[in-house]
C-alpha cells in the first residue's frame, strides 16, 4: 500500500504570531501619530479662535468710525443685551457682550473641553488651554490665549516648561 502525504493548507502558529506582532506594532505607531495629530489640531483651532476674535472686535469697532451713533455687534436688533452703541459704550461692554455665551455673536467652543472659548476670567489648571481671555483697560481690549498646557497639566506652557511660549497676546484699541 502506498501512503500519500496529504497536502495540508493553512497557516502555522508561528506565521499567525508574526502577523499579530506586526499588527500590534503598526497599531502602536498609529495611535502615537494620531495623538500627535489631535494635539496639533487643538493648538491650531485655539490660535484660529484667537485671531478670529481679534479681527471681529477690530472690524466691528471700525464701523463706529463710519457711524459714531451706530450700533455694532448686533445679533438680535430687538434685544438690547445683544448690541453695543458706538457713542455710549466701550471696551468693558464689548467684553461683557462677547463673554456672555447666550448673547455673543461669536459661538466658538474651546477645543480642549468643549466649553465656551471666549471668557473674561482666566481659568486655572488644565482648563486654561483653549480659552481667549478678554480684559480691558480704558479703551484697550487685551486678548490672551493659552494654546498648550504645560507638562504637569496644571497651567499654560511657559519657556521653562516646554522651551517655548504657548501664549498669544494681542490688543485692540477702541478709538
Where are these regions (language model features)?
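Alpha-helical interaction segments
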Residues: 23-27, 50-51, 102-106
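Membrane-proximal N-terminal amphipathic helix
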Residues: 39-69
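Periplasmic/extracellular, small/polar-rich flexible segments of pilin-like filament-forming proteins
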Residues: 62-175
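Alpha-helical hydrophobic helix detector
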Residues: 17-33
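Internal alpha-helical transmembrane segments of multi-pass membrane proteins, especially GPCRs
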Residues: 9, 15-18
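N-terminal leader/signal peptides at the extreme start of proteins
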Residues: 1-11
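Conserved Walker
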Residues: 12, 29, 44
Amino acid at each position: 500500500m502506498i501512503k500519500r502525504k496529504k497536502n495540508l493548507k493553512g497557516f502555522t502558529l508561528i506565521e499567525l504570531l508574526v502577523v499579530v506582532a506586526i499588527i500590534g506594532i503598526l497599531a502602536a505607531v498609529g495611535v502615537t501619530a494620531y495623538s500627535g495629530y489631535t494635539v496639533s489640531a487643538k493648538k491650531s483651532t485655539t490660535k484660529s479662535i484667537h485671531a478670529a476674535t481679534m479681527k471681529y472686535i477690530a472690524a466691528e469697532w471700525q464701523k463706529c468710525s463710519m457711524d459714531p451713533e451706530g450700533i455694532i455687534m448686533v445679533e438680535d436688533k430687538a434685544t438690547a443685551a445683544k448690541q453695543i452703541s458706538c457713542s455710549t459704550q466701550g471696551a468693558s461692554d464689548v467684553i461683557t457682550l462677547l463673554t456672555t455665551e447666550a448673547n455673543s455673536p461669536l459661538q466658538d467652543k474651546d477645543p480642549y473641553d468643549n466649553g465656551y472659548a471666549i471668557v473674561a476670567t482666566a481659568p486655572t489648571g488644565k482648563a486654561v488651554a483653549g480659552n481667549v481671555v478678554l480684559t480691558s483697560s480704558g479703551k484697550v481690549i487685551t486678548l490672551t490665549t493659552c494654546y498648550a498646557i504645560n507638562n504637569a497639566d496644571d497651567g499654560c506652557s511657559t519657556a521653562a516648561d516646554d522651551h517655548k511660549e504657548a501664549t498669544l497676546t494681542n490688543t485692540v484699541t477702541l478709538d
